[in-house]
Amino acid sequence: MTERNKTVISQFLLLGLPIPPEHQQLFYALFLVMYLTTVLGNLIIIILIILDSHLHTPMYLFLSNLSFSDLCFSSVTMPKLLQNMQSQVPSIPYAGCLAQIYFFLFFGDLGNFLLVAMAYDRYVAICYPLHYTTIMSPRLCVSLVVLSWVLTTFHAMLHTLLMARLSFCEDNVIPHYFCDMSALLKLACSDTRVNEVVIFIVASIFLVLPFALITMSYVRIVSSILKVPSSQGIYKAFSTCGSHLSVVSLFYGTVIGLYLSPSSNNSTVKDTVMSLMYTVVTPMLNPFIYSLRNRDIKGALERVFCKRKIQLNL
């Protein structure tokens, strides 16, 4: 290996989004508004759930954690993207790149596992309504949340440590707007076979298993409804599960489109656009999906604002 190839890099250059220079400021303003909407929307849901005692239920415990996960997941990539869109040298330090990988995996997986917990909650609420409070005890709910955090910590740490053992030499240009693992593996000048095997095995478990559990929950929900078909039962099921099913479809639809669709000549552009869907669009839409047709959230919003208004008048 030549001396040139032995040069160890200290930072990576992020190519960012394939946006023409004349449209750069327009897209910067658009992404800034979308990010601020994401932060504000998820913060409102978290604050409402904390302040309103009517929302201190298992479903809203999971929802508050999901909102926190969405807020942080978007914050892992968006601030750096916005900064680099205004910079002449869109770079990220080596340590910052590893940190971005860790938190990207952590909050992405956390949202995934919380969707499983929410699916189980909906399953119990519809199939065992009389035993709901007994089954979904505070202890079980907290255990599901803690288990989600522990599993995601392990997964994110595993990949980050494996990535840290790789050597990166001459090429330091990442054709993405954040430190994507697959893009980084292509830049490594050391053996990446262990990383690739671990990614395949663990990703299969952490994506396929949660999706299978969610699917099983909804199969049993549909089966339970069909046993006693009534317009009231169907309405209750859709009103209970509609928001969660929309979020699940949005999340897994994007992931399937990104990782399972056939590659093409412009696969880099496709990957970038699909990544924007689950790092920017999905976290922004989730608060609206859960609040627009949710009477509990609307009621909590009215109660909190009315309470604050009365306090101000006094």
UniProtKB/Swiss-Prot annotation:
Q: Which GO terms describe its biological process?
A: G protein-coupled receptor signaling pathway; sensory perception of smell
Tell me the superkingdom of the source.
Answer: Eukaryota
The subcellular location is: Cell membrane
Return one GO MF term. olfactory receptor activity
- Disulphides: C97-C179
* Primary location group: membrane
The membrane-topology field of this record reads: Multi-pass membrane protein
Q: Report where it is expressed, by tissue.
A: Olfactory epithelium.
Q: Give start-end ranges for the coiled-coil region(s).
A: none
Which stretches of this protein does UniProt put in the Cytoplasmic compartment? 51-57, 119-143, 218-239, 293-314
What ranges are annotated Extracellular (topological domains)? Answer: 1-29, 79-97, 165-196, 261-271
Print the keywords alphabetically. Answer: Cell membrane, Disulfide bond, G-protein coupled receptor, Glycoprotein, Membrane, Olfaction, Receptor, Sensory transduction, Transducer, Transmembrane, Transmembrane helix
The residues that cross the membrane are 30-50, 58-78, 98-118, 144-164, 197-217, 240-260, 272-292
- Gene Ontology CC: one annotated term: membrane
Q: Which residues are sugar-modified?
A: N5, N265, N266
CDD domains on file: 7tmA_OR1_7-like
Q: Which Pfam families match?
A: 7tm_4
- Listed SUPFAM superfamilies: Family A G protein-coupled receptor-like
Q: Which family does it belong to?
A: Belongs to the G-protein coupled receptor 1 family.
Q: What is this protein identified as?
A: Olfactory receptor 1E16
Q: Which organism is it from?
A: Mus musculus (Mouse)
Gene (UniProt): Or1e16
